[in-house]
């Protein structure tokens, strides 16, 4: 075993050098931001990281990052109170907090602004996948600003007061208008017997 130690040490060094060489733009930006922060330029460090994440997000496929039932409408991004379970009383509204990721941005009409837009289709199904109700473009969201904001969420509220007690699946299909891509998320839920 001792005769293999120099070889293993050389291999470990080669592997770590390989990883350093392949670090990529996010690692490079993090190093720049750390250097900026160490010299007291907090604003520049923050902007460096924000721009790097914004650029990286454009390489991601469109997807849903988080989808949860919430006890009340959120007050901001990641500022929500999750519902303790997915059982609802008859007549209780289903409120979902959903974070799309990998949105495509394009130039907006105003100088220097960018815009993203997505629609949300809705289906309510039984556990076997049979569609009981549906609506295209249930939600339509447009975000315009001076940067490709990553802290985007949708609050979706569904009123199911006529549904009988039982198990269901709420399916949202998010449609990124700028890329033509779609992402689907299912939220199983139950209507309690009265």
Describe the residue ranges of each PLM region.
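Intrinsically disordered, low-complexity terminal regions enriched in Ser/Thr/Pro/Gly
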Residues: 24-194
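Bacterial N-terminal signal peptides
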Residues: 8-16
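Sec/Tat signal peptide C-region and signal peptidase I cleavage site
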Residues: 17-23
């Amino acid at each position: 075993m001792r005769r293999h130690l120099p070889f293993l040490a050389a291999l470990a060094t080669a592997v770590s050098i390989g990883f350093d060489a392949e670090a990529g733009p996010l690692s490079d930006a993090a190093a720049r931001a750390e250097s900026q922060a160490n010299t007291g330029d907090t604003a520049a460090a923050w902007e460096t990281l924000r721009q790097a994440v914004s650029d990286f997000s454009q390489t991601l496929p469109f997807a849903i990052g988080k989808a949860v039932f919430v006890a009340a409408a959120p007050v901001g991004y990641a500022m929500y109170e999750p519902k303790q379970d997915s059982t609802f009383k008859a007549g209780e509204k289903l409120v979902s907090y959903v974070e799309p990721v990998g949105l495509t941005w394009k130039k907006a009409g105003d100088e220097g602004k960018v815009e993203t837009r997505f629609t949300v289709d809705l289906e309510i199904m039984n556990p076997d996948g049979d569609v009981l109700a549906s609506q295209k473009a249930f939600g339509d969201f447009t975000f315009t600003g001076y940067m490709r904001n990553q802290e985007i969420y949708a609050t979706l509220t569904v009123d199911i007061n006529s549904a009988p007690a039982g198990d269901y699946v709420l399916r949202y299909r998010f449609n990124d208008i700028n890329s033509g891509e779609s992402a689907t998320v299912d939220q199983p839920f139950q209507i309690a017997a009265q």
